[in-house]
C-alpha cells in the first residue's frame, strides 16, 4: 500500500511550485511543466522520492535514531509542532538559534536554565523572597526560552537526521547539519537547491496543506520505525532468554551425568 497517493498530493497542492521567474535551475529535473507563470512539479517523481525518504527515516528510527523537525515559517509552525509531538520527536518551529547543532553544549546550558525556571514556576514557593519585578523578569526569561527551545527540551544530543520545511529559510540549520554530517530530508520547492539535501521530496513548501501532508508522511515513517525497533528488541530479548534456558538445561544435563558417573564408579 502506498504511503501517500497521487490524489492526496494533488488535493494538497503539492504540485504547485513558484513563479517561473523565481526558480533554481538545478530544480529543472523535478519540474513537469509551467502553467500561467507557475511551475508544476512532477508528482510522479515526488512519489518516488517520498518512498526513499520514508525508508530512510523508518530505518533511522528503527536503529534508535532521532529525527529533528525544523520549520519556522508561519505556514509550517503548527504542523511541525503537532506532528513532532505526536511521534515524540524534537522540533524547532519558531526561531533557529545559530549554533543549535554545532554548539550544542552551549544550547544544553540554556536548556538547563529553562528547566530551572520551569521548576521554580511549578514550585509552591518558587518565587518566595523575590520582588514582583524580579518575578516578572524571570517569567519573561522562561517564556522566551520555552518559545525557542521548548521543542528540544528533551534532546540530549544532536539528532540522527533532520526533516526541514523550506531549505532556503532554514539555510543555517541545513548548513549546521552538513557540518556535522547529519542527513537532511526536506521538501524541495522550485526555488530550492537540491544539492544541500540528502533526501529530497520535490513539492510545495508554502501551502499549509502541502506541508501538513508531507510532514505526516515523515511522522508515519517515524511510527513504523519505532514499531520495528520494539519488534527487534522483543526478538532479541526472546533469543537471549532462549540462550539462557539452553545454558541452564546444558548445565543440568552435565550435573546429572556427573552424578551418574560417580554412582557408577562406586
From Swiss-Prot:
GO biological process, one term: translation
One Pfam entry name: Ribosomal_S2
InterPro entries per UniProt: Ribosomal_uS2, Ribosomal_uS2_bac/mit/plastid, Ribosomal_uS2_CS, Ribosomal_uS2_flav_dom_sf
Keywords, sorted A to Z: Ribonucleoprotein, Ribosomal protein
Gene Ontology MF term list: structural constituent of ribosome
Ranges annotated as spanning the membrane: none
A GO-annotated cellular component: cytosolic small ribosomal subunit
CDD domains per the UniProt record, alphabetical: RPS2
HAMAP family xrefs: Ribosomal_uS2_B
Family the entry assigns: Belongs to the universal ribosomal protein uS2 family.
NCBIfam families from the UniProt entry: rpsB_bact
Protein name: Small ribosomal subunit protein uS2
Protein species of origin: Corynebacterium diphtheriae (strain ATCC 700971 / NCTC 13129 / Biotype gravis)
Classification of source organism: Bacteria, Bacillati, Actinomycetota, Actinomycetes, Mycobacteriales
Amino acid at each position: 500500500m502506498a504511503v501517500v497517493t497521487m490524489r492526496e498530493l494533488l488535493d494538497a497542492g503539492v504540485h504547485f511550485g513558484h513563479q517561473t521567474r523565481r526558480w533554481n535551475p538545478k530544480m529543472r529535473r523535478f519540474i513537469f511543466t509551467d502553467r500561467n507563470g507557475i511551475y508544476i512539479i512532477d508528482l510522479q517523481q515526488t512519489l518516488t522520492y517520498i518512498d526513499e525518504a520514508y525508508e530512510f527515516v523508518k530505518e533511522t528510527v528503527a536503529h534508535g535514531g532521532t529525527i529533528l523537525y525544523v520549520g519556522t515559517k508561519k505556514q509550517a509552525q503548527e504542523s511541525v509542532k503537532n506532528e513532532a509531538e505526536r511521534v515524540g520527536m524534537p522540533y524547532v518551529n519558531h526561531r533557529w538559534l545559530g549554533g543549535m547543532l554545532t554548539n550544542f553544549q552551549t544550547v544544553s546550558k540554556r536548556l538547563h536554565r529553562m528547566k530551572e525556571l520551569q521548576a521554580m514556576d511549578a514550585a509552591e514557593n518558587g518565587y518566595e523572597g523575590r520582588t514582583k519585578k524580579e518575578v516578572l523578569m524571570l517569567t519573561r526569561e522562561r517564556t522566551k526560552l520555552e518559545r525557542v527551545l521548548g521543542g528540544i527540551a528533551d534532546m540530549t544530543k544532536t539528532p540522527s537526521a533532520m526533516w526541514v520545511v523550506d531549505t532556503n529559510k532554514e539555510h543555517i540549520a541545513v548548513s549546521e547539519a552538513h557540518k556535522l554530517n547529519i542527513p537532511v530530508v526536506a521538501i524541495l520547492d522550485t526555488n530550492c537547491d537540491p544539492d544541500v539535501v540528502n533526501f529530497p521530496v520535490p513539492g510545495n513548501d508554502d501551502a499549509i496543506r502541502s506541508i501538513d501532508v508531507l510532514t505526516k508522511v515523515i511522522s508515519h515513517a517515524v511510527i513504523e520505525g519505532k514499531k520495528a525497533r520494539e519488534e527487534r528488541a522483543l526478538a532479541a530479548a526472546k533469543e537471549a532468554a532462549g540462550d539462557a534456558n539452553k545454558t541452564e538445561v546444558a548445565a543440568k544435563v552435565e550435573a546429572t551425568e556427573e552424578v551418574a558417573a560417580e554412582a557408577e564408579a562406586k
